[in-house]
Amino acid sequence: MPILATSYANPPFFYLNGHFETILPSIWRKVDGVTYEREQIETPDSDFLNLDWSKVGGKQLLLVSHGLEGDSQRHYARGLVKLFNQKEIDVLVWNNRSCGGEINRQPILYHHGSAYDLDTVVKHVLSKTSYAGIFLSGISMGGAQTLNYLGQQGKNLSPLIQRAAVYSTPVHLPSSAATLRRPTNTFYARKFMGKLKKKMEAKGKQFPGLVDLDRLPQVRNFDEFDTEFTAKLHGFKDAADFYEKASPHTRIQDIGIPTLILNAKNDPLLGEECYPVAFAKSSELLFLEMPERGGHTGFTIPSSEFNYAEYRLLEFLTQS
């Protein structure tokens, strides 16, 4: 307890495995009818964050943290926005530094452990709004940021933040990094690496001498990229040090509110340690749900506008 039974059945019949369940929704899924009002806020280090609001006059707010190289326009963000808005809940999707269409001012970017920016967003929301309750959610990397933030805050978390839910989340970052090294995951590594290299090239031009751009074409995998660039920009020794220190598995025991982790067993980007079964069994606050199917940020329901994860997060976060 609390290991939760799941009601997620099967995706469309032609979604043959976790790879199909991951890739096809990212290509095909479109969520229409979502509009944002953008607000830009300053960070304590003189950078900025773009916040995309979708307000319906709700008394509660869902705060969404997106995945690696994502933003508020990703299908998984728009799906949550549309579903929660239908239930008269306002939604705020915040864009990590350099995401959402604008390169940021400072040399640093973002990563799984950069909960300090989520803290900035939460403090801004608490100071500028009067919601009766706030829910935190995160997808993939955004889930790791959310868990890290909750663990770091512990008992100091604002009482207005009532529940949290994340899905497709690398709870154990070293394990997830090891999984990405598998030959079967070359597609994902190349996809992310292409985007990250372009962003690092832009950052290198913005700050000449900050990083060795001559090394960029030689980088072949995440370990090399995170050692050469992520670690150096953000104060870690190397990739291994980054994976360990940015991983939420070291902080989930300090989370002080009911929190759901929804990770599919066939998620191709998660390692075995990303399913904290033993801890969840002994916890009164961490709820773990592990459907057999779902892939990574997939959870497709045939003929449904929304996916299972979105319905499940709504159910968990709004239960009394």
PLM features per residue range, with description:
Residues 15-57, 300-304:
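N-terminal cap/lid segment of alpha/beta-hydrolase-fold proteins
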Residues 54-105, 120, 124:
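Short, surface-exposed "cap/lid" segments of acyl-processing enzymes
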Residues 108-129, 148:
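Alpha/beta-hydrolase active-site loop
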Residues 127-131, 135-233:
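Alpha/beta-hydrolase-fold enzymes
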Residues 228-251:
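Active-site nucleophile elbow and catalytic-triad environment of alpha/beta-hydrolase enzymes
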Residues 255, 261-263, 267:
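Short beta-strand/loop motif that positions the catalytic acidic residue
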Residues 281-297:
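Catalytic histidine neighborhood in serine/cysteine hydrolases
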Residues 292-320:
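Catalytic active-site module of serine/aspartate enzymes centered on a nucleophile-bearing elbow/loop
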